[in-house]
């Protein structure tokens, strides 16, 4: 199985990135390739600097659209469905590839959300991108342990 996390953010080497690497390593024990990809280009930088919500959302869509492959695509958004960990683990059943998308500061353009199979919310709280990435990676690992009856989730 291949799981990818695409995030509108600048790549950084910090404690959050180390935690992401930790969960990537743990996922491999279940024969799952977890990839974390930070996406940030000139168009996104210019739109965000101008604080233009519509332009920023469009820039996110254009940057991420090409990653909407044959995988099961899930957008993280505050309006998305809330899951408990057991329900979240069901997302991975009978799937070979799952893509998660974490938008930028201005969220996703409606057309991009319609291109995804579902929308997911990690919490009613607003989370910073780095925190959201780590929480998502931990929940992915937790979901894998639930699927494989591993004691981590208990």
UniProtKB/Swiss-Prot annotation:
Origin species: Wolinella succinogenes (strain ATCC 29543 / DSM 1740 / CCUG 13145 / JCM 31913 / LMG 7466 / NCTC 11488 / FDC 602W)
NCBIfam families xrefs: PRK00103.2-1
Assembly description: Homodimer.
Principal localisation: cytoplasm
InterPro entries on file: Alpha/beta_knot_MTases, RlmH-like, tRNA_m1G_MTases_N
Function of the molecule: Specifically methylates the pseudouridine at position 1915 (m3Psi1915) in 23S rRNA.
Gene: rlmH
Catalytic reaction list: pseudouridine(1915) in 23S rRNA + S-adenosyl-L-methionine = N(3)-methylpseudouridine(1915) in 23S rRNA + S-adenosyl-L-homocysteine + H(+)
Record: residues binding S-adenosyl-L-methionine: 76, 103, 122-127
Gene3D superfamilies: 3.40.1280.10
Identification of the protein by name: Ribosomal RNA large subunit methyltransferase H
Pfam families from the UniProt entry: SPOUT_MTase
């Amino acid at each position: 199985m291949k799981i990818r996390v695409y995030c509108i953010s600048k790549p950084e080497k910090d404690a959050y990135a180390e935690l992401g690497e930790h969960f990537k390593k743990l996922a491999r024990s279940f024969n799952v390739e977890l990839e974390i990809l930070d996406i940030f280009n000139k168009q996104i930088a210019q739109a965000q600097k101008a604080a233009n919500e519509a332009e920023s959302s469009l820039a996110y869509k254009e940057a991420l659209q090409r990653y909407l492959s044959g995988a099961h695509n899930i957008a993280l958004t505050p309006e998305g469905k809330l899951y408990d960990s057991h329900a979240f683990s069901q997302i991975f059943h009978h799937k070979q590839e799952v893509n998660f998308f974490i938008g930028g500061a201005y969220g996703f353009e409606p057309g991009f959300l319609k291109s995804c199979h579902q929308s997911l919310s990690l919490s009613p709280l607003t989370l910073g991108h780095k925190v959201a990435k780590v929480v998502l990676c931990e929940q992915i690992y937790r979901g894998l342990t639930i699927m494989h009856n591993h004691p981590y989730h208990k």
